[in-house]
Amino acid sequence: MAGLGGEPIPDGEFTAVVYRLIRDARYAEAVQLLGGELQRSPRSRAGLSLLGYCYYRLQEFALAAECYEQLRQLHPELEQYRLYQAQALYKACLYPEATRVSFLLLDNPTYHNRVLRLQAAIKYSEGDLPGARSLVEQLLSEGGEDSGGENELDGQVNLGCLLYKEGHYEAACSKFSAALQASGYRPDLSYNLALAYFSSRQYASALKHIVEIIEHGIRQHPELGVGMTTEGIDVRSVGNTLVLHQTALVEAFNLKAAIEYQLRNYEAAQETLTDMPPRAEEELDPVTLHNQALMNMDARPTEGFEKLQFLLQQIPFPPETFGNLLLLYCKYEYFDLAADVLAENAHLTYKFLTPYLYDFLDAMITCQTAPEEAFVKLDGLAGMLTEQLRRLTKQVQEARHNKDDEAIKKAENEYDDTLEKYIPVLMAQAKIYWNLENYPMVEKIFRKSVEFCNDHDVWKLNVAHVLFMQENKYKEAIGFYEPIVKKHYDNILKVSAIVLANLCVSYIMTSQNEEAEELMRKIEKEEEQLSYDDPDKKIYHFCIVNLVIGTLYCAKGNYDFGISRVIKSLEPYNKKLGTDTWYYAKRCFLSLLENMSKHMIVLRDSVIQECVQFLEHCELYGRNIPAVIEQPLEEERMHTGKNTVTYESRELKALIYEIIDWNM
């Protein structure tokens, strides 16, 4: 008989070879050998049993269930195969089939308790929490032949899981913590406890257990290659082995990434995902795929949409997938796609969208065709949320008066959750008037919400923007921009470049030139330090600040100074020329050319020569820089040769020559 690689297996050695492969966890190779053997002896009980075991270990649960189905038909007297089939069906998320198969074992006292545990797990996975609780409590009260410490421990863990699903996170923490103390270190229990802490916003406690899982996994299984992908080491996939599953490393890294994302440490969240044991994309579990899509959306939106759309076709998928896909469609203004997905998946709407999220999405989609109607819908939603916020404010005050720490924490968490729902509604209302350039109305909307939002960074930032846009409220804008900048003053490049630029312009427009210069020196100094630490990294903050200041002077008609500032801001071109910086620069040039063509301004020859030289430099360095970042789901893509800084530089240079000849 031929073995792996075509080498013959000596007579009588086949079974030994298969068992050695299984002993060494080389299940895929064992499957290959067993598959060949079963083609010759399809009714072999040993072959089918080992094949089912290997498939189960490889987490190919549907294939394992098929093997046990065949064994059940060939050997109906051996009821363990019915149990194995039910377990494999459950793991494959085929819950109705698993329930049907397991019911036939309930009357067998040998398997009664194991079947009850399996049925409780099925009901839990289906979302039938009362049914699951009933079975768990039945198990705890009945006991059985395998009753005792282990059974009691499992029961307490199961109760912890039910408490978690019911939203009783503190009680769930107590159950998991007690179970962990009773059992000693177990990765799955540590993860459960970390998840419960995460859901109750105790991130430090959650991270403590996550770090323990990761460190334990690295020590016990260095072969899993934790962190190697982040370090740029080319490593092969470790596959979806049972060992990987037992370490809870994938779950721990996903939870750590979620915590970093919640804390707005987006780079750390992305790095956490690449730290997990390496697997091929087709091997990734749904949660990892979902998190990859979400956390890399800004850099790779097309890929992110593809992953979320793919997940929506899988059963099961992470429950957040449906809502996140719809929200991202709205963020990128694909309202038609959002409406189509809602219409095509009405059955998912009731299961995965809260009434709040459904109403919010409905209003966002309506914005495209009927902004006035959308505003009314959003106003209704905002009114409901403000009532909740006032009620929760009162609850917090009462709890503080009564010195009830538990009630204070609960009310404050509910308040924060409600505020996080209110802010997007408020911003969606404001955006309707922002798009109409009705900035006083936007300001009015924000002022109505000051009672709840005056400490919220997103609210303060947008108030600053709307004051800045009115051009006569620079002093008020400074009052909102300054705290944002000072909060991150020691790491100023963490602040958005446009915020720094707008603050500098506001200083200049209110004759606070010294403050503007001090801020610009601070930005320049930090950029120089960062360039020293990482010479290849492109940093645009100082450049964008200068571009915006140059744009301001151009807008005021001082093109000589404004254009000169724009040109100098992009030096050196290999580090400062990018899609964003080119956007600001070309706007100034287009404004300049428009005014020249209308004979409204006349530039000195030296300035024109400086402009031509600048565009020639952009032409040279802009060959591989997109002039425009295209929307991720556009069907008609721009011509790749035209969507470059080089192409647009040539167009602008040609226009300059045309206008100069015309003037002459």
Swiss-Prot record:
- Gene Ontology, cellular component aspect: axonemal microtubule; intraciliary transport particle B
Spell out the residue ranges that the record assigns to TPR repeats: 11-44, 45-78, 153-186, 188-220, 392-423, 424-456, 458-491, 543-576
Chief location bin: other
Keyword Repeat listed: yes
**Keywords annotated in UniProt:** Cell projection, Cilium, Cilium biogenesis/degradation, Coiled coil, Repeat, TPR repeat
Q: Name one GO biological process term.
A: intraciliary transport
Q: Where in the cell is it found?
A: Cell projection, Cilium
A Pfam match: TPR_16
Coiled-coil ranges per UniProt = 507-534
Instruction: Provide any one GO MF term from the record.
Output: intraciliary transport particle B binding
UniProt keyword Repeat, yes or no: yes
Q: Which family does it belong to?
A: Belongs to the TTC30/dfy-1/fleer family.
Which PANTHER family does the UniProt record give? TETRATRICOPEPTIDE REPEAT PROTEIN 30
- Relate the protein's function as given in its record: Required for polyglutamylation of axonemal tubulin. Plays a role in anterograde intraflagellar transport (IFT), the process by which cilia precursors are transported from the base of the cilium to the site of their incorporation at the tip.
This chain belongs to the protein called Intraflagellar transport protein 70A
Organism, scientific name = Bos taurus (Bovine)
Higher taxonomy = Eukaryota, Metazoa, Chordata, Craniata, Vertebrata
